[in-house]
Amino acid sequence: QGEILLEYADRILALSEDAARAVSESLGDAGEIRLCLRSSAVLVSNVLKDFIHEHPHVSFSISSEPKGCDLLIDSVSSAYDIPDNAHLLMTEEICLAVSSSHPLAHTGHISVEQMMDEKFIDLADTPSYAGVFNSIFSKCKKTPQIAYSCNDYILQGKLISLGLGVSFVASVTWTSSSLPENISLLHIDDCPHFRSIYYQPLGSFCSENQRIFEHQLEEYFKNLNN
């Protein structure tokens, strides 16, 4: 019974907060957008920069946990897996990033068998990366060596460019980022993988500023796809 009461208390509190925010907006308060950002931080930061420039009085709080947030931005391995009330922003191919000096760099593609002898650069504490890695090598008797582990995509790119290892990357996100140019992306021939980026409104209240931000998100990703 206690859990049921707590659940309803949380709902009532959330509704009260939404009502207070709606009143504040009607009085001209620009307010805050509470964003849960679990994917595509590099791309979303570009949208944030433009939005804040145009709407300097709107503030953002960014979290990795959805509770208490207005908007979730995340990715899944298939567009079929996005939540019912979510909006698909983009689907992009997962490729293998290698140094331009890599023997297969000029071919543009690689097989799973050819990847077995590669030294990989792991992205630590990134469930989506671990999911791709495990999925691709799930049917293999062994997995490739993890040569380095880092939690910074910039460091990851530097290590790849130096020829110290290879890594799986999201193709559009990678090519849209300011990363080393001497890196080639290889298509995975026999085990293609993709990821779908989406946004999902979380609260019952959606401010006008949030609607504008969502629209700018859609426009930005639409332009990336063109």
How does the language model describe each region?
Residues 183-226:
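A late-sequence structural motif
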Residues 1-25:
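Alpha-helical "hinge/linker" immediately C-terminal to small N-terminal DNA-binding modules
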Residues 80, 101-111, 191-193, 203-210:
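Short helix-loop capping/hinge motifs at secondary-structure junctions, enriched
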Residues 68, 126-184:
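Hydrophobic hinge/microswitch elements
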Residues 104, 118-140, 207-208, 224:
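Secondary-structure junction motif
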Residues 85-94, 171, 180-194:
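Short beta-strand->loop
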Residues 29-81, 150:
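Central regulatory/effector-binding core of bacterial HTH transcription factors
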Residues 82-94, 98-120:
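Flexible hinge/capping segments at coil-to-helix
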